[in-house]
Amino acid sequence: VLAEKQVDVEVKDIDPAKYPAALADANPYRTLPVLQDRDLVLYDSTIVLEYLEERYPHPPLLPAYPVARAQMRLLMHRIQKDWCDSADVIMSQQKGGGDVQQVRRQLASSLTSVAPLFADKKFFLNEEMSLVDCYLLPLLWRLPGLGVELPRQAKPIFDYMDRHFVRDTFQASLSPVEREMR
């Protein structure tokens, strides 16, 4: 979102195992990402994204109409619950040596089942870049590192990734650690 809105920002990579005490005081859940903007500290990725959309309204990443905005928020919620939560399980169990094959298969299957939706428009269910794309693209970027392999039937998703991973704003949004993921 910050790159899409061309906002200058200082990004600090934080190891969750070494969560800074100063951040822990402001974020009782010790989750990432955290946004610090002057005296304001926000956590929870959805809240951070919506704050950035309101703080930096141009270019808009949410539609102008309340019904369309609500539908987009619902999509973001589903992406979080259906896909991002699975990715979190995979990451945490990979570190702990747990078996994540079933979660990987479920995530791949769920993504593949909606692959046709990626073929209809340039962006995900939209003609323009939106917060939904900002929510979804980082997850798709991380799939190889999560050990999630999509089948050929997911071609519309591969095409979507090919279109957006090369965008200047997407590339600008990647940290050095993220660049090494692919």
What are these regions (language model features)?
Residues 12, 45, 153, 174-175:
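Residue-level detector of family-conserved "landmark" positions at structurally sensitive sites
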